């Protein structure tokens, strides 16, 4: 049944609002400083500290600037922690630009493939539309990053440093999106006509043009480089003529295939393996897999990995209850319910199911604070530069972890036997518009 707002109803709403004098005081405060500042809970600062019972050695933070590459930054942060610990090299950083280059090319290739596969469906089909919407996109997942590392290796940041177009990706992303969508229409026509020869020729031409665009904007990646650094004991190290792949294989003590994305998505069935094929970025690369488990397993495995001296990649909804200046993450940080006198509560499952919750960011766990086995707070390495938080490091309450963390990446050795067996099960395929996308 439809309902039209009447003048009588609106007058009643206004009378109700003005009947309480406190509303005018609150409205003036909110109008002057904004609803977040007006509802800021100062008591949170008294609960969150910068001291942790388990804490990894940390380096200077990185800065993704105006780009959506947090997933790549967090992955490379985990890897540089491994390099720093193994080779006693503080503040050694890896090039995000290098893997960003290959990501753009690989994504275009897979986008063209999906366009060809779905050429028999109309453009307004939900699956087809989701692929077109994702063209030129920066966002990503853990498995997307490791697919790039496994295929192309890594290089130190001085070999391929950040540039304008990697730090502010909108211009390139927009151009790539326009190019890929235009190409997609041509590929659909060729596929619908059954012109296989023309299809392969066009795809190769289009990928050659994508390569040129990214090379102009970012620069071509190096084929070889010289590794040069001084360790914490002031010893000088030099190895010449390394390839990015040989550098990774020789200098990093990690098998990326041994790591698992544990997710807590209570709108999905627990004890299941899920595959988000729509966001795979490398043909033949690591599929995007999630093992969905109750929250306590994310907590337990993350703590165990930190205690063993290894950082933890984690996916979260950072825009919720976050103060960028202080670096505080706490569920009671902004008391919006008190400000508006309404109930804003949603369960984690309901937030995911309605689009109110999402994995909007990836960061790195580098510490945890426990009191007699109870987790109080976590130390977080962000990728927003050193002007936010304490020199770029955030403090996250455990309540925030439970509400707004959806994924942690841990070694499979920390899983239960049953969970390890699930890794070889047939995954449930997720739609491109799923809440985990």
From Swiss-Prot:
Family per similarity comment: Belongs to the peptidase C1 family.
Keywords per UniProt: Aminopeptidase, Cytoplasm, Hydrolase, Protease, Thiol protease
Stored InterPro entries: Papain-like_cys_pep_sf, Pept_cys_AS, Pept_his_AS, Peptidase_C1B
EC top class named in words: hydrolase
Natural source organism: Lactobacillus delbrueckii subsp. lactis
Protein name: Aminopeptidase G
SUPFAM superfamilies: Cysteine proteinases
Gene Ontology BP, a term: homocysteine catabolic process
Cellular location(s): Cytoplasm
MF terms (GO), sorted A to Z: cysteine-type aminopeptidase activity
A Pfam entry, by short name: Peptidase_C1_2
The EC number(s) this enzyme carries: 3.4.22.-
GO annotation, cellular component aspect: cytoplasm
Catalytic residues, chain numbering: 70, 361, 382
């Amino acid at each position: 049944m439809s309902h039209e707002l009447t003048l009588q109803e609106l007058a009643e709403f206004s009378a109700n609002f003005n009947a309480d004098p406190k509303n005018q005081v609150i409205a003036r405060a909110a109008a002057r400083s904004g609803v977040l500042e007006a509802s800021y809970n100062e008591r949170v600062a008294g609960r969150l500290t910068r001291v942790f019972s388990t804490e990894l050695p940390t380096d200077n933070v990185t800065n993704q600037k105006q780009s959506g590459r947090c997933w790549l930054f967090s992955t490379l942060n985990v890897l540089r922690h491994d390099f720093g610990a193994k080779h006693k090299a503080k503040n050694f950083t890896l090039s995000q630009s290098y893997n960003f280059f290959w990501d753009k090319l690989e994504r275009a290739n897979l986008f063209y493939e999906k366009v060809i596969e779905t050429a028999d469906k109309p453009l307004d089909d939900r699956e087809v539309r989701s692929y077109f919407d994702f063209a030129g996109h920066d966002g990503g997942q853990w498995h997307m990053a490791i697919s790039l590392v496994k295929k192309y290796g890594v290089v130190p940041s001085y070999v391929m440093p950040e540039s304008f177009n990697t730090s502010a990706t909108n211009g390139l992303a927009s151009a790539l999106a326009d190019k890929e969508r235009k190409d997609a229409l041509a590929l659909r026509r060729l596929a619908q006509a059954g012109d296989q020869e023309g299809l392969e020729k066009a795809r190769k031409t289009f990928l050659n043009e994508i390569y040129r665009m990214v090379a102009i904007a970012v620069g071509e990646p190096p084929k070889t480089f010289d590794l040069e650094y001084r360790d914490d004991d002031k010893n000088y190290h030099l190895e010449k003529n390394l390839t990015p792949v040989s550098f990774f294989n020789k200098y990093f003590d990690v098998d990326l295939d041994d790591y698992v994305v544990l997710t807590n998505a209570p709108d999905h069935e627990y004890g299941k393996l899920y595959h988000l094929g729509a966001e795979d970025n490398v043909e033949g690369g690591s599929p995007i897999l999630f093992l969905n488990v109750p929250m306590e397993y994310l907590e337990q495995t993350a703590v165990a990995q930190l205690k063993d001296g290894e950082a933890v990649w984690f996916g979260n909804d950072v825009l919720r209850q976050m103060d960028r200046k202080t670096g505080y993450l706490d569920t009671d940080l902004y008391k919006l319910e008190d400000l508006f006198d309404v109930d804003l509560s949603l369960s984690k499952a309901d937030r995911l199911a309605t689009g109110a919750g999402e994995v909007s960011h990836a960061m790195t766990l580098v510490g945890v604070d426990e009191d007699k086995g109870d987790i109080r707070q976590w130390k977080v390495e962000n990728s927003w530069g050193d002007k936010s938080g304490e020199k770029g490091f955030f403090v996250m309450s455990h309540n925030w972890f439970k509400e707004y963390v959806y994924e942690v990446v841990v070694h499979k050795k920390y899983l239960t036997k049953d969970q390890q067996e699930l890794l070889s099960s047939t995954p449930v395929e997720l739609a491109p518009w799923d809440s985990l996308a």
